[in-house]
């Protein structure tokens, strides 16, 4: 299920747009995740009190965490599938400390695609969307495999 060089290029081209403003992209991704799947908010103690989209938009903590999430994901995407070193600590914390189910990784992947479609329609056509979905699926599958190694059935 690997990506071709051309597919990785499509992924990294649009990711360059994300990196130009990681905090606002991260904020939008988390808001999209929480709006589409309110149950995911329960995994974030510091955001549980944010009930409305306006409250979420006003939260500097949410923006900061969104930037952290997308910075980590960007580091993984740039490895073009050779992301074992980057993935291991992420899987460890998400499986043992945060207990984030694999399903939630699917939800945030969908939120990322949604935000990219909205913010960068000219740079995120069908081919780029397909490549990004494949890259995010590769990430999720590898996270799930690590979860299994760690004995987490998320």
From Swiss-Prot:
It catalyses: Fe(III)-heme b-[protein] + nitric oxide + H2O = Fe(II)-heme b-[protein] + nitrite + 2 H(+); H2O2 + AH2 = A + 2 H2O. Its EC number is 1.7.-.-, 1.11.1.-. Keywords: Cytoplasm, Heme, Iron, Metal-binding, Muscle protein, Oxidoreductase, Oxygen transport, Phosphoprotein, Transport. Pfam families: Globin. Heme b binds at residue 94. It is an enzyme of class 1 (oxidoreductase). The modification Phosphoserine is found at residue 4. The modification Phosphothreonine is found at residue 68. It is found in: Cytoplasm, Sarcoplasm. Gene3D superfamilies: 6.10.140.2100, 6.10.140.2110. GO terms for cellular component: extracellular exosome; sarcoplasm. This is Myoglobin. It comes from Sapajus apella. The gene is MB.
């Amino acid at each position: 299920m690997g990506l071709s060089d051309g597919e990785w290029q499509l992924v990294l081209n649009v990711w360059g747009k994300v990196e130009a403003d990681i905090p606002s992209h991260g904020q939008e991704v988390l808001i999209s995740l929480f709006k589409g799947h309110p149950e995911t908010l329960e995994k974030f103690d510091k955001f549980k009190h944010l009930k409305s989209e306006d409250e979420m938009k006003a939260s500097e903590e949410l923006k900061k965490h969104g930037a952290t999430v997308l910075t980590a994901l960007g580091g993984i995407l740039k490895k073009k599938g050779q992301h074992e070193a980057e993935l291991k600590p992420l899987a460890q914390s998400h499986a043992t400390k945060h207990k984030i189910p694999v399903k939630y990784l699917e939800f945030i992947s969908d939120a990322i695609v949604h935000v990219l479609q909205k913010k960068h329609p000219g740079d995120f056509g069908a081919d780029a969307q397909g490549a990004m979905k494949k890259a995010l699926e590769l990430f999720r599958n590898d996270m799930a495999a690590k979860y299994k190694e760690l004995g987490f059935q998320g």
